[in-house]
Amino acid sequence: MARIEKGIDITGGRSELSSFLIVLGFVFIGFFVGQFVGAIASIVFALINGAPTDVLTEDPTVLYDYLGLGEVLTTQATYTLFFCFITPYVYLRAIARKNIDVLSNERGVQFPLVFATIVGTFCFLFLNAYFIEWNANIHFPEFMSGFEDWARDLEDQLAETTEKFTTFNNFTQFLFGFVVIAVLPGIGEEFLFRGVLQNSLHRWTKNAHVAIWVSAFIFGAIHLQFYGLVPRMMLGAVFGYLYLWSGNIWYPIISHIANNGFAVIAVYYAQVEETAPNLDDTEAFPIGLQIGGSLIFIAFMFLFRNHYLKQKQSSE
């Protein structure tokens, strides 16, 4: 039986609540350590490239002006490795005292399901575009204008940073970017947020849906982009249900890599052909395509769930 019924036991003999609190501590400490190490790497690269120390001290925002694409991607990879790989690995080995393969009830993947997962993830882009547009256009009441200004400024800064490491000058840079932006986060974030955090929440709350949605919210929030929180949370929920139903961490990993990968490919296509579809803009697609894509995604989720329900029933 592959389906995860009660959450995989990674408590290390502790109570479910204390285990969850330890996991939560690992997530936030890992996040700040990853940010710190990534920042140190950025500063070192900038100093090597001749950045004056007084300029960096007075205006840290100019840091990326002294970094090439390869260096920006390297610092991003450093952050991802520390936060998304080392954090869950240390928790599993030091606290849970288990190997990382404990996160899957099923060994290997089935090619038809891999193909369906990639197609389903692509079709989810059409549905998620509505959440992207709605989230991006949220406006707060006057008394929250300070928060709105802060969130908009942070969004603009992160957009500029994203542009820095998605401006590819050749195919080799695109491949490096694909690994750093799609493959590494796809693997690491699923190990951390679905494999460790979701299982820990599932064991504590005894409710799979609460575990999935709370994990998805933390996954969305930790990216520090309020105006992208809801679509990221929706993505996290999709990954969470794929994991719950299959008991196989590799299906959410494949879906996550596909989602990020589609965006990287679209950006590279835009730079090569000087045109590309805007996946964040619902008006970029005909209404029939939007509805069709959404229906295909819903059908995929239904069939994926039923596949593993039938597997469970046949084993009983």
Give residue ranges: language-model regions.
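Alpha-helical transmembrane segments in multi-pass membrane proteins
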Residues: 40-94, 111-122, 143-147
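C-terminal membrane module of polytopic membrane proteins
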Residues: 7, 257-316
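Functionally important transmembrane alpha-helices
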Residues: 217-281
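Hydrophobic core of alpha-helical transmembrane segments in multi-pass integral membrane proteins
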Residues: 27-31, 84-89, 118-124, 288-308
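Hydrophobic alpha-helical transmembrane segments
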Residues: 64-83, 155-184, 284-296
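Membrane-interface helix/loop boundary segments of multi-pass membrane proteins
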Residues: 188-214, 244-247
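Juxtamembrane helix-loop-helix connectors linking adjacent transmembrane helices
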Residues: 53-57, 101-184
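Alpha-helical transmembrane segments and their helix-start/interface "positive-inside/aromatic belt" motifs
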Residues: 9-32, 104-123, 246
